[in-house]
Amino acid sequence: VTEPSAAPRPVRFDGRVAIVTGAGRGLGREHALLLGARGAQVVVNDVSATHAEATAADIVAAGGQAVADTHSVADPDGADAIVRTALGAFGALHIVLNNAGQGGPTGTIEQTTDAQVQMIVSTHLIGSFNVTRAAWPILREQSFGRVLLTASGSALGAAGMPAYSMAKAGLYGLTRALAVEGAPIGITANALLPIGYTRSAALNPHEDTRRWMEEHFPPHLCSPAACWLVHDDVPCSGELITTGAGRVARVATVGVPGLDRGPALTLEDVRDRWSDVVSMEGARVVMSGRDELAFYTGEATWRA
């Protein structure tokens, strides 16, 4: 007789304090609710007091612990204040889940205004930098921290949203930089590329696409991956993880040997041997600038 397998050990966050930015609605709200349900003490940050307080109240009503915070991540002083809220309410900080952001499609690069660029970059990219920087001394001092940045597949290229793609691509670089900096001091940093039916998705002009998104991509299905990436036991740092509709997968950056002519390289070599430049033969995952530099320094007698 085959014995029934034991139920998997639940993932818990007891004793951990988490900041979730942009947590009043959409993806951030779902992340905050799941963290709260699994034992974390949650700072629910959102510039809308109504929505921040509602999410915090829902966590508390379900038996969890949460407080609302309404400071803007785009303001460095606001980021400092968010961290102070965590320390004041719960006396500690372990998790920084950066989710806040404003703006999306703006049209072509010619149609995108300075004001739109500023709004998008200041929240998605600079806001994530501000809050993580404010929290970093605490995480460093305790030799433990979990940081998540909310990037997007749009960073790989998307029509009609050059500023958004730029900001999200910046988060790729920030994730990798934080992973390198945090490795010796117990801090991990990863990026989530979520696909969920949120307010911005509801603005899609194509009705068929909109309905498909609404049916298959509820925001809460992005939260298991988001929360695992800020758990004590997360096995990675510097990764880009896409999730949506129940799928979770790695998005990798790779480097290839390419064309290497040494000092003899000419413009004509690049033209005539372009197939070697872009060949995927010998490809390997590149996680940092040092990994990419290793293609040049593989035979060096000094350490890169």
Residue ranges, per PLM feature:
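Canonical Rossmann dinucleotide-binding motif of NAD(H)/NADP(H)-dependent dehydrogenases/reductases
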Residues: 10-43
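A glycine-rich helix->loop->beta "capping" turn
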Residues: 14, 62-65, 85-98, 104-105, ...
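Substrate-binding pocket helix/loop in short-chain dehydrogenase/reductase
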Residues: 107-109, 113-118
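Catalytic loop of short-chain dehydrogenase/reductase
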Residues: 146-170, 175-184, 193-215, 247
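A short, exposed helix-loop element centered on a Lys and neighboring polar residues
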Residues: 132-133, 176
